[in-house]
């Protein structure tokens, strides 16, 4: 047998290219394993071979080659929960990316092989931790296609794999992430109360206030004071005045009042969130506030910011309404 002669770093790429060659040329004649190994040897030496063989024989040999390859580079049994003789194109891209064979993976997808990034990341997270993941997405692979990075980022936050999300936004790959995915990552960070991710992104990117609207409201509703303050600070100092004025029409203060979060109320008012509509909510009885102490505390904050004459004028109406 000539298998030991084959460099294990090249073997997987060779057999995959052979498989594609067979499919492209519709080769279906029979061949034995010895002849197949001779064919591989000839390809390594860049020689042309006229040997023909059937697809089944080759695919079985491909799977044998995969075992040979993975045993050479790691102790991880990549086939533990996988249908061994699946002969599915996705199977090969899954294997290549899972073991960090990036050149092979790029070759596969460039030749139309499909892959499921969610399946790959979930497997890595469950079985491999960060070791193989870092090997796959190391900053050395900065020529990695943007679509692959964004697919991976989206799969990471969609599957709630926090450490993978954190890795991407701290790596040099972050410049390749689309605006839509960045906003989704911030929204995910708000949901899991990870202020570090948010701080990194708001420092690296300039957002329009409207980008913040949904995630900002969610931060207030989550009672997350630190994240709300971080977002407010970014809005105040990294957006233009016109955008900020539009943003101030949000209902964040209403949520803070309903949740009786006085620190949040004070924070929002101090950052110049408009309070006119809050007084209006009181007058219309739109807020379910039946505790006089609670109402007094809210009005105290409003008095400090809003025109005192207007606030005092409305005070009696508000109290009577409740």
UniProtKB/Swiss-Prot annotation:
Keywords: ANK repeat, Repeat. ANK repeats lie at residues 88-117, 181-210, 248-277. InterPro entries: Ankyrin_rpt, Ankyrin_rpt-contain_sf. The lineage of its organism: Viruses, Varidnaviria, Bamfordvirae, Nucleocytoviricota, Megaviricetes. This is Putative ankyrin repeat protein L897. Transmembrane segments: none annotated. It comes from the Viruses.
């Amino acid at each position: 047998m000539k298998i030991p002669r084959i460099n294990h770093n090249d073997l997987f790429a060779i057999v995959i290219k052979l498989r594609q060659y067979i499919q492209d040329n519709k080769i279906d004649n029979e061949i034995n394993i010895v002849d197949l190994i001779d064919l591989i040897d000839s390809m390594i030496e860049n020689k042309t071979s006229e040997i023909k063989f059937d697809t089944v024989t080759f695919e079985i040999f491909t799977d044998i080659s995969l075992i040979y390859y993975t045993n050479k580079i790691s102790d991880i049994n990549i086939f533990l929960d996988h249908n061994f003789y699946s002969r599915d194109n996705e199977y090969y891209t899954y294997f290549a990316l899972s073991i960090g064979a990036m050149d092979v993976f790029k070759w596969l997808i460039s030749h139309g092989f499909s892959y499921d990034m969610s399946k790959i990341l979930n497997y890595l997270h469950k079985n491999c931790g960060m070791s193989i993941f870092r090997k796959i997405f190391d900053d050395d692979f900065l020529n990695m296609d943007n679509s692959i990075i964004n697919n991976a980022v989206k799969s990471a936050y969609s599957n709630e794999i926090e450490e993978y999300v954190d890795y991407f936004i701290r790596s040099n790959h972050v410049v390749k992430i689309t605006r839509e995915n960045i906003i989704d990552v911030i929204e995910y960070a708000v949901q899991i109360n990870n202020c570090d991710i948010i701080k990194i992104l708001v420092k690296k990117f300039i957002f329009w206030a409207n980008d913040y609207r949904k995630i900002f409201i969610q931060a207030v509703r989550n009672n997350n004071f630190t994240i709300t303050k971080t977002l407010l600070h970014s809005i105040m100092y990294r957006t233009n005045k016109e955008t900020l004025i539009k943003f101030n029409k949000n209902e964040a203060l209403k949520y803070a009042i309903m949740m009786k979060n006085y620190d949040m109320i004070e924070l929002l008012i101090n950052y110049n969130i408009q309070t006119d509509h809050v007084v209006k909510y009181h007058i219309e009885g739109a807020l379910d506030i039946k505790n006089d102490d609670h109402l007094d505390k809210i009005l105290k904050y409003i008095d400090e910011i809003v025109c005192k004459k207007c606030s005092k004028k409305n005070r009696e109406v508000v109290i009577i309404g409740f």
